[in-house]
A protein has these predicted regions:
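Short, well-formed alpha-helical segments that are part of the catalytic scaffolds
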Residues: 12-25
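Membrane-interface aromatic/basic loop that binds lipid-linked glycans or pyrophosphate carriers
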Residues: 111, 258-282
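Short loop->beta transition adjacent to catalytic acidic/histidine clusters or analogous donor-positioning motifs
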Residues: 1-3, 24-35, 43, 56-59
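Short aromatic/hydrophobic "clamp" motif used to bind/position activated sugar donors
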Residues: 85
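A conserved acidic beta->alpha catalytic loop
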Residues: 37-46, 65, 89
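Glycine-rich, basic loop-to-helix element that forms the pyrophosphate-binding segment
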Residues: 63-80
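Acidic helix N-cap motif at the loop->helix transition within catalytic regions
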Residues: 17, 42-51, 73, 93, ...
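Donor-binding/catalytic cores of nucleotide-activated saccharide
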Residues: 90-192, 202-216
């Protein structure tokens, strides 16, 4: 079983070498590494090109303009050749046995998706590990368990490539994980979990998440809610009735009203704001 490791890289010159070397040093050896260089303005491009010269398992995909993580993942998957893929952010890293533990579970269960846990590494050395346990889910539990654990995270999973190609990727620049991973889980034959927490997520103070204000959070959570409502209305209304997505959407609408965003604030996100407004009115 070949695993493609898709690394999205944008202005992560302080972290990208650790990310790449952590995947190259995996105990599971049947891998390829696809790095998507998203028009960085720092030294990221130079670093990954040097790493690619040193290891022929690395393939670099270049964007002609900055497109964000959603596009990066999609283009990386299309350029990959593995049976399964995993996505890794350029400022994160993996423990050396992480991929092997997921592959072992995939071979044991035949699951289209196998998820590990995550370790959230914060500034100052503080960290927190979270995992789902060691279980296999099918039917509606594929989505309900994932949602119930409240860890909406895409990068700690190996996903069958044909499934990743099948599902449209959210290409917005913020809160893009959820509208993608939920449909992937729904389409999967089954979803398996392992207790390995070897995906290390760096809680970076300079990330887009930390730069968001209340209006931006509410806008993109609202768009995410609309995406999921549309998906389940088309595919599985019974699950939609069991998830709090409608109430989540209403909550975001209330926050937006309370924020009373200025024209200047709206103009920062004008295309997404117009999309949100149009979809709410329909």
């Amino acid at each position: 079983m070949k695993i493609s490791i898709i690394i999205t890289a944008y202005n992560v010159d302080k972290f990208i070498e650790r990310a790449v070397k952590s995947v190259l040093s995996q105990t599971y050896k049947n891998i390829e590494v696809v790095i998507v260089e998203d028009c960085s303005t720092d030294n990221t491009k130079d670093i990954i090109e040097q790493l690619a010269k040193e290891d022929n398992r690395i393939k670099i995909v270049y964007h002609e303009e900055n497109k964000g993580a959603g596009w990066g993942r999609r283009n990386g998957i299309e350029a990959s050749s593995g049976d399964y893929f995993i996505t890794v952010d350029g400022d994160d890293w993996l423990d050396e046995d992480f991929i092997e533990s997921l592959v072992r579970k995939a071979e044991e269960t035949g699951a289209d998706v196998v998820s590990g846990g995550i370790t959230c590494n914060k500034e100052g050395g503080y960290w927190e590990a979270t995992c789902y346990g060691d279980v296999v889910c099918d039917g509606e539990d594929k989505v309900l368990k994932f949602w119930g654990e409240k860890i909406v995270f895409m990068n700690n999973k190996i996903i069958k490539r044909e499934l990743g190609i099948k599902v449209p990727y959210c290409t917005r620049r913020f809160i893009e994980d959820t509208p993608t991973i939920i449909p992937i889980l729904w389409h999967a034959n089954k979803v398996a979990y392992v207790s390995n927490v070897g995906y290390h997520y760096r809680d970076n103070a300079n990330s887009l998440t930390h730069q968001a204000n209340a209006f931006k959070y509410a806008l993109y959570r609202g768009l995410c809610s609309l995406d999921l409502i549309d998906f389940f209305n088309k595919n599985d209304k019974s699950i939609l009735e069991k998830l709090p997505i409608q109430s989540m959407l209403q909550q975001q609408l209330n926050i937006i009203k309370q924020c009373k965003p200025s024209v200047e604030e709206l103009n920062k996100y004008i295309s997404d704001w117009l999309e949100f407004s149009k979809r709410i009115l329909l």
